[in-house]
Regions:
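Short glycine/proline-centered loop/turn elements that form peptide/ligand docking sites
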Residues: 45-47, 69, 149-150, 196
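Hydrophobic alpha-helical connector segments
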Residues: 75, 86-114, 161
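Short hydrophobic/aromatic patch on the recognition helix
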Residues: 55-66
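Basic, helix-initiating cap at the start of DNA-binding domains
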Residues: 1-41, 45-54, 71
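Secondary-structure edge/capping motif, primarily at the C-terminal ends of alpha-helices
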Residues: 88-91, 120-124, 172-176
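Alpha-helical DNA-contacting segments of helix-turn-helix folds
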Residues: 38, 70-80, 124, 131-134, ...
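Amphipathic alpha-helical packing segments from all-alpha helical-bundle domains
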Residues: 122-163, 181-194
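C-terminal peripheral helix-coil segments that are non-catalytic and often amphipathic
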Residues: 1-13, 140-144, 148, 174-210
Length: 210
């Protein structure tokens, strides 16, 4: 008769937990340091030694989690993606003001740290990730809203909206539009969503009456 005996003492799990915590702390320090550098300089000034000095880490630690500065910039882009996702979490997607409220939340996020964010958007676009890297969260917000109105045309309408959205962000990043211009242009994109909803509502009402 065999016995199943647990010989583990929990040290392996503890080591994994410590490693995960160390990674989270170190990567956060690197990301914060990168933003500090980008506020005063450009992405061309990012290096493991510079980030390490600002973050209070060793170069080896920076290299461990970000072997290249490209990966660090991508981490900043991912941070924007999460921010875009969170921007719509508490909004009522059925509300008539949802598109504008979402846009305003996105603009507030971008303008909270505009100089690094401009560079992150441009570099992520030029380094193989495209605008999708910094705006992926937006598609997760817009497409479900469209699908609730018209599942058949939702993907096409969302593609149009996202194209306009990304184009506006890229123009802001490349041409340094004013804060007011960014908000105004993104609100125009929001108005496209509102107009599309109205068209679908009218079509639905018309088919119902028929």
């Amino acid at each position: 008769m065999g016995f199943n005996v647990d010989l583990s003492d929990g040290r392996g799990e503890s080591r994994r937990e410590r490693a995960a915590l160390e990674r989270a702390v170190a990567t956060e320090k690197c990301i914060v340091a990168a933003r500090v550098v980008l506020r005063e300089h450009s992405v061309f000034d990012l290096s493991a030694s510079v980030v390490a000095r600002v973050a209070g880490l060793t170069r080896q630690t920076v290299y461990k989690y970000f072997p290249t500065m490209r990966q660090l910039v991508f981490a900043l882009a991912d941070e924007l993606t999460v921010g875009f996702q969170k921007a719509g979490v508490d909004l009522d997607v059925e509300g008539p003001d949802w598109p504008r409220l979402y846009v305003d939340a996105v603009v507030d996020l971008l303008l909270a740290d505009p100089i690094p964010n401009r560079q992150v958007i441009l570099v992520s676009a030029s380094q193989g990730r495209g605008m999708a890297a910094a705006t992926a969260g937006t598609s997760r917000e817009i497409l479900p809203v469209m699908e609730m109105r018209n599942p058949v045309e939702a993907e096409r309408a969302a593609w149009l909206t996202l194209t306009l959205f990304r184009g506006t962000l890229f123009t802001w990043a490349a041409e340094q539009l004013s804060d007011e211009a960014l908000r105004a242009d993104l609100r125009k994109v929001a108005d496209v969503v509102v107009a599309q909803r109205e068209i679908w509502n009218t079509a639905t009402s018309g088919s119902g009456e028929a």
